[in-house]
Amino acid sequence: MYFCVVNVFESKIICKTFQGLEQVLAEELIALQAKNVEVIKRAVVCDYDLEILYKCNIALRTCLKVLVPVFEFESNSPEDLYGFAIRIPWENYLDIHQSFAIDFTIQSEYFKHSQFAALKLKDAICDRFRKLNDDKRPDINTDRPDVLFNLHIHRNQVTISLDSSGTSLHQRGNRVEQTIAPINEVLAAGLILLSKWDKASHFVDAMCGSGTIVIEAASMAINKAPNIDRNYFCFKNWKSYDKSLYNDICTELSLQTKSFPFKIIGSDNNKKAVFVAQQNVKKAGFNHIIEIREVSIQKMIPPLDRGMLIINPPYGERMQTFETDRLYKQIGTAFKEHFTGYTCAIITSDTVALKNIGLKPYKKYSLINGKLDCLYCLYEMYEGSRRKPKEIAAE
């Protein structure tokens, strides 16, 4: 077998995201001064730079994982994959006393069982270490490995990367509890960035659930890097880890935070959701910025003047058709009666019920929430006469 493995380490960084958020992520990378930023499907690529690598993990809001490709080669079978992989110098990237794991994404007629391909790669790594270290090998840890490899196979093209993040970057460490079907933090951040909220006006989520959207909004409002308080990153276990540089970046980003003179309000008519949101806001350290109210969107009285409203109402199997139609009519009424001067946005998979809002969006985006195809619609509620219903006791 002809051995042709190309070492591409420290050439590119791949930042993975959700479908529909690629351009937003690209704009974030450009703001970090990343070089040669290129959008691909569900990811954005840029030139490798150690400082950028650390900043991607700490500061990007719409990034799920930060990968660094290490090896590329062609393979037509699991056995072929093993034959190539056992000759790769894994000892340059993994110490025998460290643990490791393998993530994989495989779309290939040559590898019909994705897990088996990942198993062959794991066997190759372990067998190489056994051969070099008197039958000793690194441990496997699928929960929190020291080093995480990513195996990507498309047809017969194999790319093995180092996953610098470890666990997904949406895990900000803010959740004490969660409600049913909470929105992912990366998607929540994407909704806010797509809305073009200027962070110089009020922000409201009138169906806030566990508070994810308002927490992401508060983080943006004060310019706090989303993962600056996170301790676990796999890059900290790499041989190339520069602790001094990492600490300098954290200090630099910490000094960029600022005050926010406007209001951020989350509300929900579910008592349990309100309690969960309050706990999560407290855990995130945003008690002084975010106010959580127990009130329905129909009775919610937002701050006057202009602002941004983003909601993620229940949809899919969680709602019956008649309930959904009625709810969306109420949402449309609330937009018109209570939120003049605001930009209002809604994400939903129920495009039929969406028509009951009775408004024409000025902007629409196709996104995915979990496994559901969704529309994200934005409405400009121009200044005009505003009804003034009595404020309820809950406020």
Indicate residue ranges for each PLM-predicted region:
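Short, positively charged and aromatic/hydrophobic N-terminal segments
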Residues: 1-2, 6
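Accessory substrate-recognition/RNA-binding modules or partner subunits associated with SAM-dependent
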Residues: 9-147, 164-166, 170, 177, ...
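Short glycine/proline-enriched loop/turn "hinge" motifs that connect secondary-structure elements
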Residues: 91-96, 152-153, 303
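Class I S-adenosyl-L-methionine
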Residues: 105, 152-194
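Conserved S-adenosyl-L-methionine
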Residues: 183-302, 317, 325
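Short SAM/SAH-binding signature in class I
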Residues: 306-312
